[in-house]
Curated annotation (Swiss-Prot):
Modification note: Methylated by PrmC. Methylation increases the termination efficiency of RF1.
SMART domains assigned: PCRF
GO molecular function: translation release factor activity, codon specific
Major subcellular site: cytoplasm
Species of the source: Streptococcus pyogenes serotype M1
Keywords: Cytoplasm, Methylation, Protein biosynthesis
Subcellular location, record wording: Cytoplasm
Family matches, as SUPFAM superfamilies: Release factor
Organism lineage: Bacteria, Bacillati, Bacillota, Bacilli, Lactobacillales
Protein name per the record: Peptide chain release factor 1
Cross-referenced PANTHER family: LD18447P (PTHR43804:SF7)
A Pfam family recorded for this sequence: PCRF
GO CC terms in record: cytoplasm
NCBIfam families hit by this protein: prfA, PRK00591.1
Amino acid sequence: MNIYDQLQAVEDRYEELGELLSDPDVVSDTKRFMELSREEANTRETVTAYREYKQVIQTISDAEEMIKDASGDPELEEMAKEELKESKAAKEEYEEKLKILLLPKDPNDDKNIILEIRGAAGGDEAALFAGDLLTMYQKYAETQGWRFEVMESSVNGVGGIKEVVAMVSGQSVYSKLKYESGAHRVQRVPVTESQGRVHTSTATVLVMPEVEEVEYDIDPKDLRVDIYHASGAGGQNVNKVATAVRMVHIPTGIKVEMQEERTQQKNRDKAMKIIRARVADHFAQIAQDEQDAERKSTVGTGDRSERIRTYNFPQNRVTDHRIGLTLQKLDTILSGKMDEVIDALVMYDQTKKLESLNN
């Protein structure tokens, strides 16, 4: 099937989806309605570009016809030639865009995410750097118009972050932040370093797509839920009523503790969101490991131990090791202006996928 047959098939399916989403039987089936709505949303940009492309093809045909008929009218002929030139350039641009749009879509790209950041090797300095990463993602979320909600956090004695779990909600969050999973290394002089030596520390980032209950159902028998009193600074109980929730997925041993909210039900709901995402991610990771060769052909959103980026403070430098990108803009990037890095990762991933399709 050539590219034009593929595009026509996508447009035909898009029109079929519009009809299905008006079908009362589909509307009453929540899971099917969500699946079809997501499929329609994922193909909308491709269909819009294809329809615009067909208009450009028609414009080229009309301009060529006009040139034939413009004999004796140099002004009309010149105008038609200019339109033909512009339309042919637009045609090439649309063809490149459509090739990318036809690449297999990641079904999670439009989803919200659960973001986890942990201080790793480097003690207090690693925890402080984890806090810097949290601020970077919060500010980037602001620039994108996303909602950023810290769901659970644990700090150390110097104000750094041992661990933080956040929900980031908005348009296409996963598509932009999915490349952030991995080990982030920092090189800088700690405030406690009297000799001015540069220390290296690490923080880890994990990005998981939010998983709706209708998409991934956890059997209640597979969960152990403990209720206990929330503790404040110094470990004292801060609530007379037990509101904190500890949830364990027995088959995998995955555990979530939640005590940020004032009510047990809210803590239970948040814990369920996180554990559903972690369990789904756990099994998705197993499946992804079985397709190791395929994963290595792209940017790499799978290997959680992979050192993906280095932040060098003395040189104001950020290096993404996966794509060989180096920018002397560390201060800018940590302030939340991440577009240059993320756009480069997306472009690299798309290019690699195009190459693998052509081979």
